[in-house]
Amino acid sequence: MATWANLGLQNSSSPLMEQLNFFHDHTLLILIMITVMIAYIMFMLFFNKFTNRYLLHGQTIEIIWTILPAIILMFIAFPSLRLLYLMDEINSPLITLKVIGHQWYWSYEYSNFLNLEFDSYMIPTNELDLNGFRLLDVDNRIILPMNNQIRILVTATDVLHSWTVPSLGVKIDATPGRLNQTNFLINQPGLFFGQCSEICGANHSFMPIVVESIPMNYFIKWISSQMN
């Protein structure tokens, strides 16, 4: 999700997103090296006067251009597989948050507590505070404790949605009749914005997500106030 004057990825706010950023840079470096090498070879072939009229086949070069791409692909595949398994791993979560997608808003349930649930709608532009974020702010934010493992259970009631917060490295489909899960750890306090990333109808663009990360002692106070 692009932000103002942002030409790259958003700043990482979770260990998983830091790993995804590293993998992005790692893969991009390999692609740049391949592009430069191919461009150099093509340039040298076009602008030299060497010819070999009797070359029918070159077994050595054929072996090289078969084995070398396989080795390069392994350098991309192994870190990618490691990340895929990291994203599926659930590490003793402290909090479980259930997310339900609707046309066109989100519902949240804190599974560890009784009767703690709410709907989250986008605040219309004409009702927005002066310092609010247009098309991104919501009436009820998700409040989560920082530096703790959080499990997210995601589903939908009508059509396909996708719960996505880029700076946390989270993108998980909300599918009717299916419960998907993932986990993350927020390593700093702040507000983190996301949006539905699956086209789900006329108001697909108006399903923002706001996660507010706070220290544990403030989270306990917030839970107490909600329960009372």
From Swiss-Prot:
> Where, per UniProt, does this protein localize?
Mitochondrion inner membrane
Kindly give the membrane topology term recorded for this protein.
Answer: Multi-pass membrane protein
Q: Tell me which SUPFAM superfamilies the record gives.
A: Cupredoxins, Cytochrome c oxidase subunit II-like, transmembrane region
What biological process terms from GO does the record include?
Answer: ATP synthesis coupled electron transport
Give the Pfam families listed for this entry: COX2 (PF00116), COX2_TM (PF02790)
The UniProt annotation places Cu cation A1 binding at: 161, 196, 200, 207
- Tell me which cofactor or cofactors this protein depends on: Cu cation
| The EC number(s) this enzyme carries | 7.1.1.9
Keywords for the protein's UniProt record, in alphabetical order: Copper, Electron transport, Magnesium, Membrane, Metal-binding, Mitochondrion, Mitochondrion inner membrane, Respiratory chain, Translocase, Transmembrane, Transmembrane helix, Transport
Q: Which InterPro entries match?
A: CcO_II (IPR045187), CcO_II-like_C (IPR002429), CcO_II_C (IPR034210), Copper_CuA (IPR001505), Cupredoxin (IPR008972), Cyt_c_oxidase_su2 (IPR014222), Cyt_c_oxidase_su2_TM_dom (IPR011759), Cyt_c_oxidase_su2_TM_sf (IPR036257)
Please list the residue ranges that the record places on the Mitochondrial matrix side of the membrane.
49-62
Task: Identify the residues that bind Mg(2+).
Answer: 198
Write down the top EC class of this protein.
translocase
Q: Which reaction(s) does the protein catalyse, per the Swiss-Prot or TrEMBL entry?
A: 4 Fe(II)-[cytochrome c] + O2 + 8 H(+)(in) = 4 Fe(III)-[cytochrome c] + 2 H2O + 4 H(+)(out)
Record topology, Mitochondrial intermembrane segments: 1-26, 83-228
Cofactor binding comment, as recorded: Binds a dinuclear copper A center per subunit.
Its family remark reads: Belongs to the cytochrome c oxidase subunit 2 family.
What is the protein's known function? Component of the cytochrome c oxidase, the last enzyme in the mitochondrial electron transport chain which drives oxidative phosphorylation. The respiratory chain contains 3 multisubunit complexes succinate dehydrogenase (complex II, CII), ubiquinol-cytochrome c oxidoreductase (cytochrome b-c1 complex, complex III, CIII) and cytochrome c oxidase (complex IV, CIV), that cooperate to transfer electrons derived from NADH and succinate to molecular oxygen, creating an electrochemical gradient over the inner membrane that drives transmembrane transport and the ATP synthase.
Provide the assembly information: Component of the cytochrome c oxidase (complex IV, CIV), a multisubunit enzyme composed of a catalytic core of 3 subunits and several supernumerary subunits. The complex exists as a monomer or a dimer and forms supercomplexes (SCs) in the inner mitochondrial membrane with ubiquinol-cytochrome c oxidoreductase (cytochrome b-c1 complex, complex III, CIII).
What is this protein's name? Cytochrome c oxidase subunit 2
